[in-house]
């Protein structure tokens, strides 16, 4: 089973990935957790290139770098793991490309869909959890309210995070559009809930999907 987590930076995806991995492992399932971009030596190098705050990268180059990282990760890690019967939990997948490079950067959505299909080997998630958070709340999680006006001048932000508030508002709107198009796959959860409340909603959705918890398939 391929489970993906989506949301803008600061939504709490990483926390929920860890919680879900622990839950499934305790029930006898083999679980692999990965993040995008990254996961292989080459993909990690691409990640550093993409997130380095001083790098000036065009929108098309950014798209192709993210996609190259995904193609590398899919072929070398994810596809073999799925074929071996392992559950794979991903912190970001192709929905991030659609939201960030499509809605955020304004690239053609049909072009993105084809690139996403190629890079992901045509594999789609069994279920996606989208943790919904406003860009303003995301920034407040990283900065105090007093320092919020200076957030985008901070060296604490990586290149993607430094794209500005309006960019992240477009990204969030993009996620909502993706959700509207695929409500059967994507589960939206309020990221302002407590981590445990979010975890319970995730488990409830998986139970509704009839995911076995004893390691049997």
From Swiss-Prot:
InterPro entries hit by this protein: P-loop_NTPase, Thymidylate_kin-like_dom, Thymidylate_kin_CS, Thymidylate_kinase
PROSITE patterns: THYMIDYLATE_KINASE (PS01331)
Source organism superkingdom: Bacteria
Keyword Transport carried by entry: no
Sites where the protein binds ATP: 7-14
Gene Ontology terms for molecular function: ATP binding; dTMP kinase activity
CDD domains: TMPK
Classification via Gene3D superfamilies: P-loop containing nucleotide triphosphate hydrolases
Catalytic function, reaction form: dTMP + ATP = dTDP + ADP
Keyword annotations: ATP-binding, Kinase, Nucleotide biosynthesis, Nucleotide-binding, Transferase
Enzyme's top EC category: transferase
Pfam families tied to this protein: Thymidylate_kin
One GO CC term, this protein: cytosol
Record-listed E.C. numbers: 2.7.4.9
A GO biological-process term: dUDP biosynthetic process
Listed HAMAP family: Thymidylate_kinase (MF_00165)
Function: Phosphorylation of dTMP to form dTDP in both de novo and salvage pathways of dTTP synthesis.
Family: Belongs to the thymidylate kinase family.
Protein name per the record: Thymidylate kinase
Protein's organism: Chlorobaculum parvum (strain DSM 263 / NCIMB 8327) (Chlorobium vibrioforme subsp. thiosulfatophilum)
Taxonomy of the source species: Bacteria, Pseudomonadati, Chlorobiota, Chlorobiia, Chlorobiales
């Amino acid at each position: 089973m391929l489970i993906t987590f989506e949301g803008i930076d600061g939504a709490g995806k990483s926390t929920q990935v860890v919680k879900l991995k622990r839950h499934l492992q305790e029930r006898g399932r083999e679980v692999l957790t990965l993040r995008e971009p990254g996961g292989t030596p080459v993909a990690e190098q691409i990640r550093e290139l993409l997130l380095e705050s001083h790098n000036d990268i065009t929108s098309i180059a950014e798209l192709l770098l993210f996609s190259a990282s995904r193609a590398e990760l899919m072929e070398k890690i994810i596809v073999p793991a799925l074929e071996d019967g392992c559950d794979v939990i991903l912190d970001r997948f192709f929905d991030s490309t659609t939201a960030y490079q499509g809605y955020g950067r304004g690239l053609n959505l049909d072009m993105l869909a084809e690139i996403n299909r190629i890079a992901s080997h045509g594999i789609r998630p069994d279920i996606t959890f989208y943790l919904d958070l406003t860009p303003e709340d995301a920034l407040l999680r990283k900065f105090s309210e007093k320092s919020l006006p200076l957030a985008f001048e901070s060296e604490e932000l990586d290149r993607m995070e430094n794209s500005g508030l309006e960019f992240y508002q477009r990204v969030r709107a993009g996620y909502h559009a993706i959700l509207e198009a695929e409500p059967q796959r994507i589960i939206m959860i309020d990221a302002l809930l407590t981590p445990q409340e979010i975890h319970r909603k995730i488990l409830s959705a998986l139970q509704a999907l009839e995911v076995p918890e004893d390691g049997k398939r």
